[in-house]
Structure formats: structure tokens, C-alpha cells
Regions:
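C-terminal output helix
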Residues: 1-2, 110-112, 126, 130-139, ...
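Non-catalytic signal-transmission and effector/linker regions of two-component phosphorelay proteins
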Residues: 1-31, 37, 44, 158, ...
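Conserved acidic segment of CheY-like receiver
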Residues: 26-39, 43-47, 60, 75-76, ...
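Acidic catalytic/metal-coordinating carboxylates
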Residues: 58-59, 84-91, 106-109
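Receiver (REC) domain active-site loop signature in two-component systems and cognate sites
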Residues: 81
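Recognition helix of helix-turn-helix DNA-binding domains
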Residues: 182-215
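Basic, Lys/Arg-enriched C-terminal extension of HTH/homeodomain DNA-binding domains
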Residues: 205-233
């Protein structure tokens, strides 16, 4: 595989802007990894032909060494490659916290491998040779999945930020209120007066921007389970 396949210059926006300019973009970036240079080139050119930004690599090791911008998008990975396989790369990316959707390509109808990949979070598993439209449809679906994932992550991050700004008692009141408990029930559970509960509740609602019980429930449910589990009544 030619070294040029691993260079950042492989990424281009329609206006021909640089990799650094593209890094700040919200445009999807499709990352192609295939040890066959002809296939790698063909996939790259197909993506560029429909106005998608793309970068290509000849091996999983080259991808892991490359500094890539944090942009929505997906991976297109060949399953069987020398060294680190596509499935092993999937595990490595998950360990690094990279949740971009993965589309796997394979020349084999390997059902167990397909099941393993899909269970680990792959969004599609296509058999080579892949029809252009089938691949583009899979990429479009993967981009939608990633945009949804990123939006959910942003909501969760904001919820955690607001939650961490609450006092311990306010966090307890939030959990209880989101569970449907009345002020007097919360007061009994926490061993404090109902007036104190109302004060904590008012302060908590102001901090998280909640006006109704529905807002409280949404704020609580938007928190990741490990964060919710930290709060005991």
C-alpha cells in the first residue's frame, strides 16, 4: 500500500480546504481501512464522488497512528487484514471510547464473524464486491446513527454538568422527585422537614432549568446509569 494513503491530505472538502480546516467542520468524515490498495482507492473515490469527506488507510496500524479530527461519520473496515484485523480494531476503538459506527466489508460469507461484529456494535456487514448504492446507503445510515449518538452524548454531558453543580441533598431530592415521591414523602425518607425539602427542590430546579415534574424526570433520565446509581436516598 502506498504511503500516500495514510496522509492527512487524503481528506478534502468540496472547496479543497486543508485537513486543519476540515477538522473544525461538522461535516461527516468517512474512514476507510483496507489492505487492498485498489479497493481502498475505489471506496475513497466513490465517497468523494457524492461529496463526502473521506480518509483512507492501508492497515489498522496506520489508522491507529494517525491523528484524526473529532467529527461525525463512520468507519469502513475490511474484516481480514494482516496484523490487526478489522474485528480486533473494532475492539481497540471501543476501548479508546471511539463510538463511531462501523461498516464491515468481507469477501467471505462468515456468519459467526458477522454475528460477532454486529453484537460488538457494527451497523452493517457487507459482502464484497459491494454495489455502490448499497455501500452509500449503509454509510448514510451510519452517519445518522453517529449524529444521534453524538447528540445523546452532548445531552448527557450537559446533564452531568448540571447534576454535579447540585449539592448532595439536592441530588437526593432530584432522584426522589423523579421517582414520583411527594415532598412530605421525601422529607420522611431524608429525615428533614417538608419546608427544607421545598427549599432544596426550588434551588435544584433553578440550577437544572426545570419548571415541571416532567422536566425533572427528563433531567434525571438523561443522566447515565452510573451517575444515577451514585445517589442514595
Amino acid at each position: 500500500v502506498e504511503a500516500a494513503l495514510t496522509q492527512p491530505e487524503a481528506i478534502r472538502t468540496p472547496t479543497g480546504s486543508s485537513f486543519e480546516d476540515a477538522a473544525a467542520s461538522d461535516r461527516p468524515l468517512i474512514i476507510v481501512v483496507d489492505d487492498d490498495p485498489d479497493i481502498c482507492d475505489a471506496l475513497y473515490e466513490l465517497l468523494r464522488s457524492v461529496d463526502l469527506d473521506a480518509v483512507r488507510f492501508g492497515s489498522t496500524q496506520e489508522l491507529l497512528r494517525a491523528p484524526l479530527p473529532d467529527r461525525p461519520g463512520c468507519f469502513i473496515l475490511d474484516v481480514r487484514m494482516p496484523g490487526l484485523s478489522g474485528l480486533e480494531l473494532q475492539s481497540r476503538l471501543a476501548g479508546k471510547g471511539d463510538g463511531k459506527p462501523i461498516i464491515f466489508l468481507t469477501g467471505y460469507g462468515d456468519v459467526p464473524m458477522t454475528v460477532q461484529a454486529m453484537k460488538a456494535g457494527a451497523v452493517d456487514f457487507l459482502i464484497k464486491p459491494v454495489r455502490d448504492q448499497a455501500l452509500l446507503d449503509a454509510v448514510a445510515a451510519a452517519i445518522d446513527v453517529d449524529r444521534g449518538r453524538r447528540a445523546s452524548a452532548a445531552v448527557a454531558a450537559r446533564a452531568i454538568e448540571q447534576f454535579d453543580a447540585l449539592t448532595r441533598r439536592e441530588q437526593q431530592v432530584l432522584r426522589a422527585a423523579a421517582a414520583g415521591m411527594l415532598n412530605k414523602q421525601i422529607a420522611f425518607e431524608l429525615g428533614i422537614s417538608e419546608v427544607t425539602v421545598k427549599l432544596h427542590r426550588g434551588s435544584m430546579m433553578k440550577k437544572i432549568g426545570a419548571r415541571t415534574i416532567a422536566d425533572l424526570v427528563r433531567a434525571w433520565e438523561s443522566l447515565p446509569a452510573p451517575v444515577r446509581d451514585r445517589v442514595a436516598i
